[in-house]
Amino acid sequence: METNDNTDGIEVEVAADSAPTAALNGTEPTKGVKREKSAEAEESDGSDIQPVSKRRRKASVKTSPAVKEQSTSPKKPESTKPKVEAPSPKPAVPKPSDVTPEEKSPSVEEEEDPLESEDEDDLKPELAKKSIEKFQAKLQASGKDPYPDWKAGTPVPYAALCTTFSLVEMTRKRLEITDHCSLFLRQVLRLTPADFLPTVQLMINKLAADYAGIELGIGESLIMKAIGECTGRSLAVIKADQREIGDLGLVAAKSRSNQPTMFKPKPLTVRGVHEGLLGIAKVQGHGSQDKKISGIKKLLSAADADTAGKGVDITKDKGGPSEAKYIVRFLEGKLRLGLAEKTVLVAVSRAVQTHEAELAGNKIPSAEEMAAGENIFKSVYSELPAYEVIIPAVLEHGLFKLPEVCKLSPGIPIKPMLAKPTKSITEVLDRFEGKEFTCEYKYDGERAQIHFVSPDSIHQYPGAVNTLQKDSKGLSSIFSRNSEDLSKKYPDVLGKLDTWVKPDVKSFVLDCETVAWDTEAKKVLPFQQLMTRKRKDVKAEDVKVKVCVYAFDLLFFNGEVRSFVFLAHISQRFAESLFLSSPS
């Protein structure tokens, strides 16, 4: 394995007082060529390019009866004869009298579509401020206890979360979606703070952090079988409904509402649903399918207890706040709400800030304080993407102390910084005019984030024991850009850590790119070669496709977070601190 200091998928990265970095071993790197990846490659690695959010153009309503296209050509004298305009390829602007509420000119909260733009950072400052002010107005108008649906100290009813989901599903306004989530989460904090974590996890359609590797792994046919067995309908009827409706969640809502029950089941709770789904995800081994179906039936049998046997019009309000609908959608891995995780981050931040102010007897935080809190929460999550760690910390220490107690740490993979595509190199140079920046090579490989803790430092990172592999050399693992554990795919890399890492190194998190490597010709092989490696149960001695690891960023070193140190400064110093003089 060779170790070189070069690049990831970010072609250009801003750095101050920097110069282009060179390979540690002096070899000339081979540039990667952008190309379409296969489905397997997309699943295993994914692109390092941030997707471009497209914003739908909406026609504005004008009171003038005549609507004309604007032209850049010189204005000609108007003729008294009536003009016959050629049909325009653009959609015609409707007359004011014909405009429906959906077609009206977008207001501030309508300007963004959650299904089209999921990046909260795209919000303009004035739009973000209006969003916060709108949320504050709702808080002031709602009184002391908005939406008091359950008694304080009792478990959060799953029906209450489904009501919030339904409100979110009925709008495409991202700011309104954020308000619904914020107000509900504030209610959870006030009445049942112990259920705050599972509530947030169900909102983002996850049972645990990505690096935990917990997946439901349930196919559509298995879900349909469970719905049929639970509601007494044949599989053929369920399949026919699915073909007609196209949404298995609505099929479940329809089936459950038409099923009479003799005894009313105990209402579902958020924690109960989360634990039930987690139990389904952890089922393995012989007879696992039957056990999963049994777990699904248990949840569906207790769902929608108040409407069971009464029939529900699934064409009204998109099926309404049906518990069965959202349980099945969660099992499918798609809630279909248009609820981005970044929106939930903002909602959590606002709910926490408002709750803390209420406990302290203070006024509702100002727009500036809200914005500062949101930035802190986003920053902490980007560095430590684990709600299991952040949520308990924020409840114990408060939002503004999070940066002190929640920092990047070995064992929890940090999310990668994605590149933002540009149309040309001149656009990049114009954007960075007057600044020094570092250019690096793009390798045709797979992102690899290497975590390491030496044996005598394990006690400093107790959480790492649960996520990193342990051997006589300490704790170590490799994570993908999607936080998937790749340790079983690259045992040859982990097996050689002690041959290129200095013995006095206590801990590090190293961002790298692994590429297929020709050991004889000393050159990078095509990406397709790398994808021929087995993903599981790989033995180092059986590896046929050798790899070269190009290190390009040191995020954490000997207890010190270095993710905010300029890249060029890291490149100049981290090689001599981390690597042996002659990497093997």
Description of each model-found segment:
Residues 1-583:
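N-terminal nucleic-acid-engaging modules of covalent nucleotidyltransferase systems
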